[in-house]
Amino acid sequence: MSSLATDLQPIDWSTIEDAIYDWLAGGVEGFDAIVPDAIWEDQNVAQPDYPYATLKVTAHRKEGGRDEVRTTTLTGQPAGQEIEILVTGPVQMTVAVTFNADAAAGGAASATRARSLAAKAQASLGLPAVVDHFRGAGLSIVAEEGVTDTSLVINGEWLARATLDVRLRTATQMTQRAGYMDKVQLETDDLGVDTTVDGS
């Protein structure tokens, strides 16, 4: 039996990242934006105006249990590609959302502002509109962790920040093309059988 892996990506990261961005920056119908803009930490872009959020997938792991395997017979395919095997498995990811507030208001006031934005994002994860929004991207909300004050001083400048970790679940999908066996050799000395079964 021959096989051929397809070019399907296990996880549609583009759709997932867009869904997370839209949740924070106003892409959910019936729900106001939490911040005017958000960026992924690995993006090579200019820093947005305050307040804004930075995003990062900090963990990504497969959940326990066996993957689901489905097979489909395809018509009109060349030999060796008549069967499509789809393997699906659940995975969890942790997304760190850091809210950055304008430090011009002063250390205490700006830190409170950052924590308030994180708390608003945390509470919003229970709204039906937000739940449906993530579901449309193939995501389910597993848990939202506590809000952590991650403010710090860099080069003498106070940076007011608060971080919220969100655990999301999605599924990996991989497909493989396979074919039927052309021939099977059957041989046994006890029964005196020595034959070839042609599967074509």
Regions found by a protein language model. Give the residues of each.
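Small/polar-rich, solvent-exposed N-terminal microdomains that initiate assembly or binding
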Residues: M1-Q81, D182-V184, D189-S200
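Terminal, regulation- and interaction-focused segments at domain boundaries
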Residues: S2-I11, V95-N100, A108
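Residue-level signal for secondary-structure boundary sites
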Residues: E63, A105-G107, T172-Q176
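Short beta-strand/turn micro-motifs at beta-sheet edges
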Residues: G80-V87, V153-I154
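Oligomerization/assembly interface segments of phage tail-like spikes and tubes
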Residues: V87-A104, A121, A160-T170
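Structured, beta-strand-rich domain cores
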Residues: T98-G126
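Acidic-leaning, charged glycine-interspersed low-complexity segments
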Residues: S116, A123-M174
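Hydrophobic secondary-structure block in the mid-to-C-terminal portion of proteins
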Residues: N155-S200
